[in-house]
Regions:
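N- or domain-start disorder-to-order transition segments that initiate the globular core
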Residues: 9-49
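Domain-level signal for soluble alpha/beta catalytic cores
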Residues: 11-22, 29, 96-102, 107-121, ...
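Active-site or pore-adjacent capping/gating segments
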Residues: 292-357
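Active-site-facing alpha/beta catalytic cores
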Residues: 2-8, 74, 87-243, 247-248, ...
């Protein structure tokens, strides 16, 4: 019996991956891109600290599957971001990893060719190159930190990160978040509960030690200082929205009870829109109204937006993909995005400077 194999019984294969250090040497961060990342992070810190009166708005596709469409979108968004910059800090949503309740396409890093070949190394190259290109435009980026290893490859290009509703309760993701170099938004649970996000904020503010990889790709003990810029993202749940003024007030109370900063972001999509993109602009209007009525705690917004409306399934023949249309959640189109953000800017431009920090 001594020759019996006892490990890797269900592992089909293993292959080495490029190290974070090597990827960064191949695709280095330029001075302009680094400035964009740093300025974006600091602006979000200042908004959360009450030093900057603006709202920060994370807007972009539900997920990235076509880098050319993403670049086209980024050029348009940069122009709009400059136009509304006195009132809104616009950050582009650049999501490469998609959590799955069961199975499905897991995102550009995991399967960049959309054909179940899982060319992860190519996915990391494609993803980092896109993030660098967007940063070169002067547009900060945001992503979801889903895989605890990929931040070592990409986090130097990111100004804001999210932890999703399915992973906010995960100890692994809380530990990772305590060491990330930017503000982190924790979504409430898929059932709508706030406790998981509030507890996550408490956890990540403290130092942690855990297993990870270093820049040379070696397994390492990671020791963190803690991250004091965690905040709640209200995304609805349990079949109900939670962006209304009563839900926001309940969130404020929960944060106050936990002695945490009252810094709230509202996700206009997911359960807050019943996954109907047409509802997202209505959520933006409601948040605008709450701020006009005196709300002080809402500091950020998230909008799922693409070049074109709706979504599509990934076809067997990838040539049949519609350009600029999401392959995951349905998004609002560019024209709707422009109108919604311009309307918000016009209504809040004279109000936000008078808002208390």
């Amino acid at each position: 019996m001594s020759g019996t194999k006892l490990e890797n019984l269900n592992v089909a294969s293993q292959e080495p991956l490029i190290t974070p250090e090597a990827l960064k040497q191949e695709l280095p961060l330029s001075g302009k891109a680094a400035e964009t990342v740093e300025n974006g992070r600091q602006a979000i810190y200042d908004i959360m600290d009450g030093k900057d009166h603006r709202l920060f708005v994370v807007v972009g596709p539900c997920s990235i599957h076509d880098v050319e469409a993403a670049r086209d979108y980024a050029v348009k968004l940069k122009k709009l971001a400059d136009e509304v910059s006195d009132t809104l800090l616009v950050v582009m949503r650049v999501y490469f990893e998609k959590p799955r309740t069961t199975v499905g396409w897991k995102g550009l890093i995991n399967d960049p060719h959309l054909n179940d070949t899982f060319d992860i190394e190519q996915g990391l190259h494609i993803g980092r190159r896109l993030l660098l290109d967007i940063s070169e435009l002067g547009l900060p980026t945001a992503t979801e930190a889903l895989d605890p290893i990929s931040p070592q490859y990409l986090q130097d290009t990111i100004s804001w990160s999210a932890i999703g509703a399915r992973t906010t309760e995960s100890q692994t993701h809380r530990e990772m978040s305590s060491g990330l170099s930017m503000a982190i938004g924790f979504k409430n649970g898929t059932d709508g509960s706030l406790d998981v996000a509030v507890n996550a904020m408490k956890s990540v503010s403290h130092p942690h030690s855990f297993l990870g990889i270093d820049q040379q790709g070696k397994v390492a003990i990671i020791r963190t200082r803690g991250n004091n810029y965690g905040h709640v993202v209200l995304r609805g749940g349990g079949g109900k929205p939670n962006y209304d003024s009563v839900s926001v007030a309940l969130c404020e109370q929960a944060l106050e009870k936990a002695k945490l900063r009252q810094s709230i972001m509202v996700d206009c999509s997911h359960a807050n829109s019943s996954k109907d993109p047409a509802i997202q602009p209505l959520v933006l209007q409601d948040i605008t109204h709450q701020i006009l009525e005196g709300n002080q705690s809402i500091q950020g917004l998230m909008v799922e937006s693409n070049l074109n409306w709706g979504n599509q399934s990934i076809p067997e023949n990838l040539a049949d993909l519609k350009y600029g249309v999401s392959v995951t959640d349905a998004c609002i189109d560019w024209e709707t995005t422009e109108k919604a953000l311009r309307d918000m800017r016009d209504k809040l431009k004279d109000v936000l400077p008078k808002r208390r920090g």
